[in-house]
Curated annotation (Swiss-Prot):
Family affiliation: Belongs to the UPF0246 family.
Cross-referenced InterPro entries: YaaA
Stored PANTHER family: PEROXIDE STRESS RESISTANCE PROTEIN YAAA (PTHR30283:SF4), PEROXIDE STRESS RESPONSE PROTEIN YAAA (PTHR30283)
GO CC list: cytosol
Gene Ontology annotations of biological process type: response to hydroperoxide
Native source organism of the sequence: Histophilus somni (strain 129Pt) (Haemophilus somnus)
Protein name: UPF0246 protein HS_0482
Pfam families documented for this protein: H2O2_YaaD (PF03883)
Length: 258
């Protein structure tokens, strides 16, 4: 079983990182091509392209300039410790054990606009490049065209190593679109998290993102390798709802926010 999550816009380069043997990202030759394209853009162009402030554009221009193809502990940080957002609030990586992280290294992947696919302990440098960015490149008008089947192939290799051909999609639609689903040839399970609001169950973005992190944490801590085990997820007050679920979409509902 392999689970996928999205990265986060906000980065954490401050908190302590445990001493691990870190791994190298596999697709940096492609990352370098994207960096070289981004280096040709002015701060104003970056601001417009990414819909960010002039200040953030300046920061990211500097990041593109400073990026190096060599990744080491001086210029990089392990991916699982580098992102800080709603999903990662649910994941609470700082409370996971060393054995948990080693399990995650085999069973979790972070999709990335710049790096394609990252393992938890893969080193990465600070960047902002969302998968939905319309960055023109040699392959087309956006990052979906750029990555083509590269991300799909990388995930396929990782899934084959698991031996069970199961992918748990905990990524956002923006990132999941980078995968060519029909070429994967695996069973894909999509957990959906609904909260009771005014008597109706709805996807509430903030809570759903955090729940995806909670599910990721559950998979790691319980060493989940079987689809049926996913249904036992109960963190944050969510419960599996069989009547609303299908064979590929597992619905979890919550009445009281915890």
């Amino acid at each position: 079983m392999l689970a996928i999550i999205s990265p986060a816009k906000t980065l954490d380069w401050e908190s302590a990182v445990p001493n691990f043997t870190f791994s190298q990202p596999h697709l940096t030759a492609y990352s370098e091509k994207l960096i070289n394209i981004c280096r040709q853009l002015s701060p104003a162009q970056i601001s417009s392209l990414m819909s960010i402030s002039d200040k953030l554009a300046g920061l990211n221009v500097a990041r593109f300039e400073q990026w190096q193809i060599e990744h080491n502990e001086q210029n990089s940080r392990a991916a699982i410790y580098a992102f800080k957002g709603d999903v990662y609030t649910g994941l609470e990586v700082e409370t996971l054990s060393r054995d948990d992280i080693q399990f995650a290294q085999q069973h979790l992947r972070v999709l990335s606009g710049l790096y394609g696919v990252l393992r938890p302990l893969d080193l990465m440098q600070p960047y902002r490049l969302e998968m939905g960015t319309k960055l023109a490149n040699e392959k087309g008008k956006d990052l979906y065209a750029f990555w083509g089947n590269i991300i799909t192939d990388a995930l396929q290799q990782a899934i084959e190593q698991q031996g069970d051909k199961i992918l748990v999609n905990l990524a956002s639609d923006e990132y999941y679109k980078s995968i060519q689903e029909n070429q994967l040839g695996v069973k894909i399970i999509k957990p959906v998290f609904l909260d009771n609001k005014g008597g109706k169950y709805k996807v509430i973005s903030f809570y759903a993102k955090k729940a995806r992190g909670l599910m990721c944490r559950y998979i790691i801590q319980h060493r989940v390798t079987d689809i049926e085990q996913l249904k036992e997820f109960d963190l944050g007050g969510y419960q599996f709802n069989p009547s609303s679920s299908t064979q590929t979409e597992f619905v979890f509902k919550r009445d009281v926010i915890k």
